[in-house]
Swiss-Prot record:
Native source organism of the sequence: Saccharomyces cerevisiae (strain ATCC 204508 / S288c)
Name listed for the protein in its UniProt record: U3 small nucleolar RNA-associated protein 6
Domain of life of the native organism: Eukaryota
Role this protein plays: Component of the SSU processome, a pre-ribosomal particle required for the maturation of the 18S rRNA from the 35S pre-rRNA precursor.
Stretch list, region Disordered: 216-241
Length: 440
């Protein structure tokens, strides 16, 4: 009862303000207070549920909408610069806070809380949202969606790429075996570099000093007033995790210059993360499927290693599809890095000898890489011939079954992507391509 009375007493100045401004009558205010009393009793009872908090929030939201409408209609203004302008919104935030304290495991309610605070824009402090994320991450450090949400908030709202990178790396210390978090980290790095390159093109930023000043100004413009004092306090992983993932790039790595002078601007940061990702996911996959004790049966060990490579290969194909989306980057350079990765023997296995189906997939990607992004209108015959040369170089080293499989796939690729889209009568390239396909 004491809590209920205390919370209701906090409403009195707000109710007086609403009556004084002529926005609500005394009778309406009494009904609002009665409704709030009912909600407070429910919230403070032992049998309260998360739905009670949601209903209370919905009710307060409706009261605030009605207040805003009357403010515009009666007073002819959007704001009255008085207590009732912000008190209801503040109460809604407080109800959310109380709900998360009582039901800390309800992630949907946490998401509603965050969305509400973010939707308020400048009315919500950067520090407040940080505090919510801090609470969430301490309670749910193994939920990667929270880490991703937090990282995106830093970058997309505040253009704080250093903080975003730190959040991803801290998240990976807790969740090194989760592919989704690695994928989103790589995606962030590619988005960051793309945005940086395009911005510099538009603004004509050539020398490094201009680029550095622009980055500082952009971050300053997006910085909230209380951002400097607020830091994300991520939970500790303990001493055993301190040296793990130490191959990841530093948060303040230089991105000045151009792609010719700075490999970071070609996507090398993302590629470094890809390499660490493959190594880490592979290790955790093996540990998960065999435990931490060695398998004595060598045949079982080989099968597990093959299974691991299949798993990693499927993940690497997702990255190739991701690279396809970044039109402003050297996509063939990024994909070639993945192909080079698979040329190395791993877990005492070779793709070519032990997993020929996977090997043929890398071959197919390699021989079509230089024409991968050429639409039929821009197909260059010289580049096509280079692709064909690669094809013949590969089949000279393959067995007959593999040659047949690669031949069929390469032929279908050329027909579906180019030949069928050409005009046989008007396009001189048609006969050349048709002849090439017939000689494969």
């Amino acid at each position: 009862m004491s809590k209920t009375r205390y919370y209701l007493e906090q409403c009195i100045p707000e109710m007086d303000d609403l009556v004084e401004k002529g926005l609500f009558t005394k009778n309406e205010v009494s009904l609002i207070m009665k409704k709030r009393t009912d909600f407070e009793h429910r919230l403070n009872s032992r049998g309260s549920s998360i739905n009670d908090y949601i209903k209370y929030i919905n009710y307060e939201s409706n009261v605030n909408k009605l207040r805003a409408k009357r403010c515009k209609r009666i007073l002819q203004v959007k704001k009255t610069n008085s207590l009732s302008d912000w008190s209801i919104q503040q109460r809604i935030g407080f109800i959310y806070q109380r709900g998360t304290n009582k039901f800390p495991q309800d992630l949907k309610f946490w998401a509603m809380y965050l969305n509400y605070m973010k939707a308020r824009g400048n009315q919500t402090s950067y520090k407040k949202i940080h505090n919510i994320y801090n609470q969430l991450l301490k309670l749910h450090p193994t939920n990667v969606d929270i880490w991703i949400s937090c990282a995106k908030y830093e970058y997309e709202v505040h253009a704080n790429f250093k903080s975003c990178r730190n959040i991803f790396q801290n998240g990976l210390r807790f969740n090194p075996d989760v592919p989704k978090l690695w994928y989103e980290y790589v995606k962030f790095e590619l988005n960051f570099i793309t945005k940086l390159i395009n911005r510099r093109k538009v603004m004509g930023l050539i020398n490094e000093r201009e680029q550095e000043l622009d980055m500082q100004n952009e971050q300053k413009n997006n910085q909230a007033p209380d951002e400097e004092k607020s830091h994300l306090q991520v939970p500790s992983t303990g001493d055993s995790m301190k040296d793990k993932l130490n191959e990841l790039p530093e948060a303040d790595i230089s991105v000045l210059g151009n792609a010719e002078t700075n490999p970071a601007l070609r996507g090398d940061i993302a590629l470094t993360i890809f390499d660490v990702c493959m190594k880490t996911l592979g290790k955790h996959y093996i540990n998960k499927h065999k435990g931490y004790y060695a398998i004595s049966d060598s045949k079982m060990n080989i099968e597990l290693n093959k299974e691991t490579l299949n798993y990693l290969f499927s993940e690497s194909l997702r990255y190739i599809k991701l690279f396809d989306e970044f039109l402003d980057l050297e996509r063939d350079y990024l994909i070639n890095h993945v192909l080079q990765f698979w040329k190395n023997d791993m877990y005492d296995l070779s793709l070519r000898k032990d997993l020929p189906e996977l090997y043929l997939k890398t071959v197919m990607i390699d021989i079509t890489l230089n024409i991968r992004y050429m639409p039929v209108e821009k197909l260059d015959i010289d580049q096509l011939q280079l692709s064909v040369k690669k094809y013949f170089a590969y089949i000279s080293k393959l067995d007959s079954a593999s040659v047949k499989s690669l031949k069929n796939e390469y032929r279908s690729y050329l027909q579906d992507n180019y030949l069928k889209k050409m005009n046989a009568e008007d396009d001189p390239r048609y006969k050349i391509l048709d002849l090439i396909i017939s000689k494969l």
